[in-house]
Amino acid sequence: MDMTLESCRKFVEVLASDAPAPGGGGAAALVGAIGTALGNMVGSLTVGKKKYAEVEAEIIALKAKCDALQTELLNQVVADDIGFVPLAKAYGIPKDDPNRDAILEEATITACAVPMHIMELCCEAIGYIKVFADKGSRLAVSDAGCGAVCCKAALQAASLNVFINTKSLKNREVAEQMNAKANGMLNTYCALADEIFNTVKAGFGQ
């Protein structure tokens, strides 16, 4: 089932159930898409305004990138579900099966791929939102701040879906490579999201 085609209420209802998907990864992707859309909205409210004519071309180009990014993040809701299937099947293999460990290892690495990609997309979104916050309509700057907060949350949530899998990998070299990549994104882009939030907040005298 493609949960992105369901209502918000249905998504939350299934998320709260014992269904295997959506889970944390799918939720992270959806929150990231919402955060990206909030930044994109600032662009929509900027284009066509005489006050922002000098940056209009840049904003239009940025909006096109966000359109694609929103779609890609929503696609990850389904991709995360699909990526988890091999791991779920691997855990069902009898423990005395000589191939179990190798199959489980491969499935665990596969399960890391989608949340890692969600992290990358959220980092990209936060970078775009910084531009919207700096150059977009002042009337909608709070939405840019909200978008940054959402994308930071999505980034952090996706990272946990990486770390829960790397923790169980037997190949520690591969695990540490993925951990280093994920932590690098967290360190850089959580800080940038915080900077956006604090700048927007300060603009309101807070």
Residue ranges and their predicted role:
Residues 30-34, 62, 69-76, 107, ...:
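Amphipathic alpha-helix face/heptad-repeat signature
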Residues 80-149, 153, 165:
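Amphipathic alpha-helical interface segments
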Residues 125-128, 140-199, 206:
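Preference for long, well-ordered alpha-helical segments
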Residues 50-89, 185:
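A structural-propensity feature for long, helix-poor, extended segments
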Residues 3-21:
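Short, hydrophobic/aliphatic alpha-helical segments
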Residues 17-40, 140-158:
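Conserved phosphate/anionic-ligand binding catalytic regions in large, soluble enzymes, centered on
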Residues 41-53:
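Transmembrane signal-anchor/signal-peptide helices with a preference for the extracytoplasmic
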Residues 79-91, 193-206:
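Long, charge-rich low-complexity segments
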